[in-house]
Amino acid sequence: MPINSESCPLCKVHSNTIKKEDEDEEDNKTSWIQCSKCKVWYHVHCLDLPTDEIDQIVIYHCPECVPKYGESTYKRKSKRARVSIDYQSLNEGDTFAIDKSSHFHLHNFLNFKGETNINVIDKLTKTYALNTQMEKPILIPQADLSKNGMQLPIEKNEITIDYITDCCGEDTPLEVMDVISQQGISPPWKLKQWREYFKTNEEKRDRIRNVISLEISDVAKLGVDFTRPKCVRDMDVVDRVWIEEDEQKRSKVTKYCLMSVKNSFTDFHIDFGGTSVYYTVLSGAKTFLFFPPTDNNLELYKSWCLEPSQNFIWYPEYTITKNKKKIKPTGGFKVDLQPGDLFIIPSGWIHAVHTPQDSIVIGGNYLTIRDMVMQLKINEIERETKVPTKFRFPMFNKVLWLTAWYYYNHQNEFQSDIGEDEDGNAILTRLIGHLQGHLELSKTNATAKRSIPKTIGKPMVFINKLLAWKEDLYGTAV
């Protein structure tokens, strides 16, 4: 299905008259804030909110929602020296007293019980991933770097906050998340400010904050000298299909440095675009709580995302009525990670993350051809839940056109890249259907039109070639 671009309703930053590269640059520079009621995202500067006010907002109500729900909720300063509490008003005046030293869902997280269901191996290869169809997360404990085709810039225990700051530069802007509100802090911090906070004693930190989006692909030493696991590089479809001569640079989502203080918590989410994730812990520890991407779990997840009070609803206990029966998420379990562990999260898995102690992690995202059906399913959920463009996989549609073009021209690689037991017919059917919808959207949407690569020639002619190829392979038409 086609994507509808999300934009700030108070400005024309994403109007059709602006070039796509300008949109990307603007998104990278702009701070956003989301209304907790209507879920619409706004540019902070369009709202004319004073800079010193932004970090004090706990629950934001946009101008359209203020008449119905009242003014935004701000932090309240506690007069008690030893306990720091936020008071947040919810539906019809209900009030929650929230300890700012930990997220209010953390108790539920820590007490969750479920039978762990992962694959534990010592060497990750493309062959293994395809043979197991990536049905479960994969853990490589204390991974042998050379055996897994991975390389760190220096020893893992030497990758400290000081080393990261030296590599990136202390004036590097940083998106910092406030753990209690699960909102980004505005204005962005500088890395030197984060270093000071990260090195502050736990008891002296005013709030729990988290950094999960520092992309380091082009950072000397830290990113440039880091090599992703070979299996990840072998399966990353963007690596395979992106044309180096393209006027747009490929998306930078392959190498992130995550820095989390003790008791950081990220609520349930699915990684953007249904990407798979590799994750290696350098110091500290992490605990994940997973739910598999079954049809029911994804339906519950989508409904949960649309709840006005989503932040205060514990996803594992969320219920909806389906076929006259109440259903709730099933199959949940936790996984603990320690320094040296390498971890793979398959496409579409719903997860929350807790940090039991200060930690530094390097990880990244990647699309695959074998996960195309799930990736498009997650893309549709993102569209239906109105996830803003800045939080989605960059140039997603362009990547899909290039993927189709590549495999049409390298047909002998298609089955080997999806695995012998994978349903290639379903993959091509879903991919072609998406491209047909996107082509239709491009007739009225300039952004969609720009994302169709010129290298494929006339899009409709190319789609007909794809249909003919699929029919030759499987004897069916879309």
From Swiss-Prot:
Pfam families: Cupin_8 (PF13621), JHD (PF17811), PHD (PF00628). Substrate binds at residues 266, 286. CDD domains: PHD_SF (cd15489). GO terms for molecular function: histone demethylase activity; histone H3K36me/H3K36me2 demethylase activity; transcription coregulator activity; zinc ion binding. The keyword Cell membrane does not apply. Keywords: Chromatin regulator, Dioxygenase, Iron, Metal-binding, Nucleus, Oxidoreductase, Transcription, Transcription regulation, Zinc, Zinc-finger. A zinc finger (PHD-type) spans 5-68. Fe cation binds at residues 269, 271, 351. One of its GO terms (cellular component) is nucleus. Its EC number is 1.14.11.27. Its main location: nucleus. GO terms for biological process: chromatin remodeling; regulation of transcription by RNA polymerase II. SUPFAM superfamilies: Clavaminate synthase-like, FYVE/PHD zinc finger. It catalyses: N(6),N(6)-dimethyl-L-lysyl(36)-[histone H3] + 2 2-oxoglutarate + 2 O2 = L-lysyl(36)-[histone H3] + 2 formaldehyde + 2 succinate + 2 CO2. Binds 1 Fe(2+) ion per subunit. The JmjC domain mediates the demethylation activity. Histone demethylase that specifically demethylates 'Lys-36' of histone H3, thereby playing a central role in histone code. This is JmjC domain-containing histone demethylation protein 1.
